[in-house]
Amino acid sequence: MSSASMFGSLKTNAVDESQLKARIGVLALQGAFIEHINIMNSIDGVISFPVKTAKDCENIDGLIIPGGESTTIGKLINIDEKLRDRLEHLVDQGLPIWGTCAGMILLSKKSRGGKFPDPYLLRAMDIEVTRNYFGPQTMSFTTDITVTESMQFEATEPLHSFSATFIRAPVASTILSDDINVLATIVHEGNKEIVAVEQGPFLGTSFHPELTADNRWHEWWVKERVLPLKEKKD
């Protein structure tokens, strides 16, 4: 994806301190960060904001690494030593971190495919990803994915179906440990491909849930992954 935002401008969410449930940072070096922030700021009790420096990472309850160019985002992380060290510290601390598309690549232990190697990976998840698995940007598509029963999506029907947008998307081509929980798959050219995984506090989705009108992934992540860990710490 290009670095330009696809939808509108950044929106804020005025939340009284007594009603504040979670502070969600979105890495804002490049990619579709505005869309994630705007969705998060539409959720009751959530404040979301851009993360560009190590200082921006202070007092956050969760972090989203958005889609974009994994090589570009990786380079920008790598040249900012303070930000890089802070992100690695958040991984070591077990902060809930969600990577979408390029963000999933950055969370992986290994990556392959693409024109250039990734200059930096956080190596938080025991997966190997294949970049640009479905082809170039001209072959982007939207399709229904099947999510597991454990997702516990609410309200919107069908309960376990979700329309997902894939833009030069990766897949989790190799699972490197039994600690990986597969959350969603699609069938592509007759093969079942893994497009969403989690490992402990880390979530990776190869698609862009921020580019649809369905906010269930964001709501689920806050309710089922961010808030329980925050409550344990509090």
From Swiss-Prot:
GO terms for biological process: 'de novo' pyridoxal 5'-phosphate biosynthetic process; pyridoxal phosphate biosynthetic process; pyridoxine metabolic process. GO terms for molecular function: glutaminase activity; lyase activity. Its main location: cytoplasm. It is an enzyme of class 3 (hydrolase). Keywords: Cytoplasm, Glutamine amidotransferase, Hydrolase, Lyase. The active site is at C101 (nucleophile), H208 (charge relay system), E210 (charge relay system). It comes from the Eukaryota. It is found in: Cytoplasm. Pfam families: SNO (PF01174). L-glutamine binds at G68, E69, S70, R131, I167, R168. GO terms for cellular component: cytoplasm; cytosol; glutaminase complex. It catalyses: L-glutamine + H2O = L-glutamate + NH4(+). Its EC number is 3.5.1.2. Signal peptide: none annotated. Belongs to the glutaminase PdxT/SNO family. This is Uncharacterized glutaminase C222.08c. It comes from Schizosaccharomyces pombe (strain 972 / ATCC 24843) (Fission yeast).
